[in-house]
Amino acid sequence: MLRIADKTFDSHLFTGTGKFASSQLMVEAIRASGSQLVTLAMKRVDLRQHNDAILAPLIEAGVTLLPNTSGAKTAEEAIFAAQLAREALGTHWLKLEIHPDARWLLPDPIETLKAAEALVKQGFVVLPYCGADPVLCKRLEEVGCAAVMPLGAPIGSNQGLETKAMLEIIIQQATVPVVVDAGIGVPSHATQALEMGADAVLVNTAIAVADNPVMMATAFRLAVEAGLLARQAVPGNRSTYASATSPLTGFLEALA
């Protein structure tokens, strides 16, 4: 069970809505993933009508919607987008994204912290997408963010946990949930994130661009479950030396 702010989730896999070939395929993949929290970019939906091709099936599926501010380049733009989302969707939950560079889509740490502090004061449950910077994540936690979402690698790159060393520090020092966001390309990346202590992962591109998104979504669901179970089982310590699983002495005498 994962708790973030005022909500609890059985699934530790969050999903996105971009890059799918159709809305129907998107919904089928989300259902296969078991995800209960789904992000959507405000710039991609028509907020004037709930029969929007992306929004309507998500509402029907009964998942928790997490609007994001993707496309915002400044704190001011992100705050404005957040206010529109709250008014249109009736939710105070928000994934805060501010990335001014369209090529790398790396989050702006200064603008993100600035916007996060303002949005928390306005009553939003803020989940900020940020770099894998332990100091920044701690500052975001201190201003009231309900979770932190450090990247594993650039958005959509499928590179995996390239920031593993920093993610481990973030996880170790965090007192709010840590959701590894961006860069996760295959289910084993998700397993690794859960094994190392992350509370959840957010996956979009890896599922949406697969030849079979529904099958890939299922694979990610199982991978996240495996990673969580492995962590709860408490793996044995790593060792430089070998440690025999069978006795090396006495077996000849026993056979005599």
Curated annotation (Swiss-Prot):
What gene does the UniProt entry assign to this protein?
thiG
Q: Name one GO cellular component term.
A: cytoplasm
- Where does the record place the catalytic residues? 95
HAMAP family referenced in this protein's UniProt entry, alphabetically: ThiG
UniProt name for this protein:
Thiazole synthase
What the protein does comes down to:
Catalyzes the rearrangement of 1-deoxy-D-xylulose 5-phosphate (DXP) to produce the thiazole phosphate moiety of thiamine. Sulfur is provided by the thiocarboxylate moiety of the carrier protein ThiS. In vitro, sulfur can be provided by H(2)S.
Q: Does the keyword Cytoplasm belong to this entry?
A: yes
Q: Show the catalytic activity.
A: [ThiS sulfur-carrier protein]-C-terminal-Gly-aminoethanethioate + 2-iminoacetate + 1-deoxy-D-xylulose 5-phosphate = [ThiS sulfur-carrier protein]-C-terminal Gly-Gly + 2-[(2R,5Z)-2-carboxy-4-methylthiazol-5(2H)-ylidene]ethyl phosphate + 2 H2O + H(+)
Could you say which EC number(s) this protein's record lists?
2.8.1.10
Enumerate the PANTHER family for this protein: THIAZOLE SYNTHASE
Q: Which organism is it from?
A: Salmonella paratyphi A (strain AKU_12601)
